[in-house]
Amino acid sequence: MPIFTPPSPALQKAWWKETIVYQIYPRSFKDSNDDGIGDLNGITEKLDYLHGLGIETLWLNPIFASPNADNGYDISDYRQIMPDFGTMEDFDRLLKETHARGMRLLLDLVLNHTSDQHPWFREARTSRENPYYDYYLWWPEEQGHPPYRKSHFDEEGDAWCYNAPTRSYYLHYFARQQPDLNWQNPEVRAEIYDILRFWLDKGVDGFRLDSIPYIAKDTSFPEIDLCKYPDVFPYYSLGPHLHDYLHEMNREVFSRYDCTTVGEGSKTSPEEGWKFIAPERQELDMLYHFGAADIRNETEADDPATGIPYSLLALKRMYAEWDAAVGDGWPTIYLGNHDQPRMVSRFGSDTPEWRDLSAKMLTMFLLTMRGTPYWLAGDELGMANIRFTRIEEYDDIDTRNHYRKLLREGRDTEQFLREQQEIGRDNARTPYQWDGSRYAGFSVAKPWLRVNPDHTEVN
């Protein structure tokens, strides 16, 4: 009798291996109420268009209540919808209509930090004795100034912010309005698992988990020795118990639902990346690494994102290394997102002569690799970088804070603005170009971010 050998995990079918994920930046997709801001009802209006494209899964950037210091990545209430985007009833309708077309919906959740306006932090910052104090990471003033850590978005560059009522510094690896959660506290993890269940019980099909390697830190905060350890990333993330936390989250939540998970793993190496998605480890399904975003030109010393062409050889080698490293895990394939330049500008050519061919070539690349392909809304049109010329045109907190820092230090802001034309995050966040009308069919009101002037030709 022949012996049946089950297929390897990499060959086992799963809906999230056979789908195309289409990323929607809700603020920029479609405005349904004429206030210049995209919203949930605008997405619902365009579901037939997306279904006609062959899109099977939507990923929405954060839609939760937020003061918008970082466009929704500073969440003040995980169970409420941001008023700019609509109501919970609007979300329920969007979810129902998405499922009615045989499509699925993923939500973008930020679990490394909250807004400083979240009720947890508003309580935590009042007193060391407050039970919510241990929901966050602090350094008491009696121990002196904490060891240096760099903030990604803070204008001063320091990831520690002093809080007088508690006589201590709180940690924020991103903006000071985004205090980092203390995942070592089991009460924090229990709260997060309840949030995940809330949305899964509503029927969402999974999550993209923002900055997931950052949830675990070495909270002794050793001094960074750049001579001994030039790669500083392990000082910030990939800390003790990271994979214990992810396994626990899978066991307590994800394994009980028909859902998928993809973690954002910036700066994660292929050797580390497989740990997140190896089927036998039961953590996440996919990892959204930044290999393509970090590609360098092997013949130039400068950063390729400032206009120097990338190395095709390096791009091919990077994807080959990741494919080999993840083994039976399942990779992701993407060339752009809301934090990166437009893919046709970064990896192809956005000149009139080559834009169309570049967009088609890059899309073919995404669809022919092993792994789940991710598109950013507008990639199918060949939407390109907008190339703002004045700082006032930018909305992004990272760009604006960096500019102020350079201005204060008397450094070259004109060169910085030229670089932002190539690498700035707002390049990917301009309103979707539905048609050639004044505001590209996105809205009848002035949009929150300027429409790319090429929308009369590219729509």
Residue ranges and their predicted role:
Residues 1-459:
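Active-site and adjacent substrate-binding regions of carbohydrate-active enzymes
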